[in-house]
Amino acid sequence: MNKMNYIVRQTEDSVLLKSILTGYPAFVVAGVLFSAIMEFRIVYPFFIILYILNSLTNKVFKNVIFKPSMGTEATRRPSGMGGTVGRTDTPYGCGLFASGKISKTSGFPSGHSQFAAMAATFWILYVLRQYRKEGKWRHHGAKEYICMALKILPFVVMALLVMTQRVQSRCHSITQVVVGAAFGIVIGVFGFKVYQHTMEYKTRKV
């Protein structure tokens, strides 16, 4: 198994970035809860709800919608996962907490890629909203555009690293990763739109 280790510099978003980097939802929830304790914002519990929705959606995709096609090339996990090249009964040996047991789940779509794309999409839109709300890019020009890009870029890079690792470790095929990412982006946009409308309604009510 090809293990990839990444180091993220300490920033105000480092907990979230590291969580997205690992691709393990449990770490993300812990990171968001930690951030909420340090400085409570309604966006944190909202994101946890979105995470639960995303997880349930992925389970429905794998265990209901695409389960009938288990065994086909599109849904089967790639041969060679966990160092078992040429076998079709590849063990679940690519995760951080690998059990070594035979994988019984569909590889379509990639749950890690779906989550990484969802999280990155949501937080990127959140950063853009904050800049629009504060009107920074209208008053400071290029400097604020650069600062905004530097805040957004890590989320993009982290999501891409997760997706790349899922393919290189042969946990998923490229198709499974791309489709998972597409679903994640849709859920991320949907979740942010709901959050945005919720905040606008709250503001009007006040």
Question: What do the predicted segments below correspond to?
Answer:
Residues 40, 78-206:
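Membrane-embedded catalytic cores of phosphoryl/pyrophosphoryl-handling enzymes
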Residues 1-105:
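N-terminal transmembrane-helix/juxtamembrane module of multi-pass inner/ER membrane proteins
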